[in-house]
């Protein structure tokens, strides 16, 4: 199996052509292509030429992330064409992955897929991330990666990072050098513009 994520852990996105090329190689060698869609709601509304239809066309299985889009739990697994393995539902049950009262997970996706809510709340993350990105640029911060998604990777002085820890939640990513660290700021469906403004004021 070939396993890819869209968006990736680094906040990057595949292009439609890249997805088509990977799919072509996988199909030539009869290797299933799996797309991790934990952040799919953010990837679909970021600046990209990849649509949900493209993902369905080029992959054998993907999942639509729920927890990163406001659901209490659950992801929606989608098998394309006739790619679902034999006895898949039985295997799910035998391996302890079938939730009792699983319809409660389904109800969340029913709500998320109504009136494009899934995409609308994804837009909030992208819009707030764009404001954060622009504000950081204006303050002279360096970016480790140019991400069009809700994940922004910023190089901070170690001293500034330690100060920021007192008031802000963010992810340590890796050391840039002895005096600088790369951190990740991630916006979400719930991020407010005032949250972004507060963060920028602390930087």
Regions of interest found by a model, annotated:
Residues 1-37:
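Active-site phosphate-binding strand-loop segment of PLP-dependent enzymes
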Residues 1-13, 51-139, 144-148:
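Active-site C-terminal subdomain of aminotransferase-like
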Residues 8, 39-41, 68, 191:
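Active-site-proximal loop/turn and secondary-structure-junction residues that shape catalytic pockets
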Residues 16-24, 28, 39-61:
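Active-site pre-lysine segment of PLP-dependent enzymes
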Residues 19-23, 129, 200:
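Generic structural signal for well-ordered alpha-helices
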Residues 19, 78-81, 93-94, 168-170, ...:
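Short, solvent-exposed amphipathic alpha-helical segments in soluble enzyme
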Residues 2, 22, 35-36, 76, ...:
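Buried hydrophobic positions in well-ordered alpha/beta secondary-structure cores of metabolic enzymes
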Residues 130-131, 135-203:
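Conserved C-terminal alpha-helix-loop-beta "cap" of PLP-dependent enzymes
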């Amino acid at each position: 199996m070939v396993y890819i994520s869209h968006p990736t852990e680094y906040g990057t996105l595949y292009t439609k052509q890249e997805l088509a090329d990977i799919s072509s190689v996988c199909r030539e060698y009869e290797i299933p292509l799996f797309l991790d869609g934990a952040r799919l709601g953010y990837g679909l509304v970021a600046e990209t030429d990849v649509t949900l239809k493209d993902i369905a066309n080029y992959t054998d299985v993907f999942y639509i992330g729920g927890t990163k889009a406001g659901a209490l739990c659950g992801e929606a697994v989608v098998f394309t064409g006739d790619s679902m393995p034999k006895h898949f539902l039985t295997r799910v049950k035998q391996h302890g992955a079938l939730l009792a009262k699983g319809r409660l997970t389904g109800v969340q996706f029913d709500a998320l897929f109504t009136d494009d809510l899934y995409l609308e709340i994804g837009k909030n993350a992208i819009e707030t991330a764009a404001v954060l990105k622009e504000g950081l640029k204006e303050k002279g911060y360096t970016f480790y990666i140019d991400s069009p998604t809700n994940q922004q990777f910023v190089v901070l002085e170690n001293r500034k990072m330690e100060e920021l820890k007192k008031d802000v939640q963010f992810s340590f990513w890796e050391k840039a050098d002895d005096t600088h660290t790369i951190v990740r700021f991630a916006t979400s469906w719930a991020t407010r513009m005032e949250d972004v403004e507060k963060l920028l004021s602390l930087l």
